[in-house]
Amino acid sequence: MDLRVAAYGVVTDEGGRLLLARWTEGRRLAWTLPGGGLEPGEAPEDAVRREIREETGYTVRVGELLGIHSRVIPAGRRVQKASEPLHTLRVVYRAEVTGGKLRYETEGSTDRAEWFSLPAVAELQRVRLVDIALRMAGIL
């Protein structure tokens, strides 16, 4: 079984909007939390800072650990063809923008980043992790 450990941020602004990134590597385009896989030896807090900067242009202060979501994806349901299941551990933090300017990632797994009101999030094509993390944060 393969293992992937990733870190994600629930980033909201003063108006309660949520920062999301549009993921392009799935079976379909879908909005997700900014974040991604840890580099070898990288701490989850550092990974979420790096990934948010890469995907959105913002620098953030990493706050409270909201939770860890564990999921096993059968081999036949993985995005990339594989013979083994994938165990994903997704570490979710609250994060706050401290600087930077909104921009899109180039040559990465996302192609857009945008702020959404919670009612607008409910209408988006999104990955399950968005709702899982919003429940962890007490927003849903």
Residue ranges: model-predicted function:
Residues 1-18, 94:
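Conserved N-terminal beta-strand and adjoining loop/helix that marks the start
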Residues 17-54, 58:
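Conserved Nudix-box catalytic region and its N-terminal flanking loop in Nudix hydrolases
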Residues 59-68:
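A short coil-to-beta-strand element that immediately follows conserved catalytic motifs
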Residues 71-102:
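Active-site-adjacent beta-strand/loop module that shapes the phosphate/pyrophosphate-binding cleft
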Residues 94, 103-135:
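NUDIX/MutT-family hydrolases
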